[in-house]
């Protein structure tokens, strides 16, 4: 019976982790480009009392054996990179990705990070940057006298300048894809970094080699479904209550033993 206390405790810990993941999803329901997570669990080691297939007598063998589980543990938080909705902003510097791929940005230490958040801005040097101030790569400089900015589905960035009828190309927005998006590491600020599990980054022109297309004047919203998360929350609450009941029931059984 002491084992059942610890087994139920692992269930409580697992459901608390599940609840933390759901709460984080709901907290980021309005975060541009956010991808929801899902907690993944696995059962713990088993106490084998009778090996399956062992002989029970000279003539017979056990068909199933006797194994007692020791609980559950969280093994991963899987990020689901499904497409979010495109929300129109009519801001010429906002760009949404429809399909696969990430924008590449430069971190302060010179390394690269990746994001789905295309709510870009222009800094004091005319550089195209994220809302957090990270420079888009390859670098794109918007002239100070630019009257308008046009970003094509293929990532070509052009500006219209005073005194010039034809637009002038000032840069190219590329997309980076990975063999395993789920293997990317989240570092906050809507950014991911490459890991061994994600595979090497592959930079492509939007619309080529499996990369998505760009939509100017839109941002990609979070792919969190509030109704689905609330249903998951109810399931977690019930599972937590059941494990709590297992703890209290075991405690009552132990009390009965001590009264004998």
Swiss-Prot record:
It is found in: Bacterial flagellum basal body. It comes from the Bacteria. Coiled coil: none annotated. Its main location: other. Keywords: Bacterial flagellum. Belongs to the flagella basal body rod proteins family. This is Flagellar basal-body rod protein FlgG. The gene is flgG.
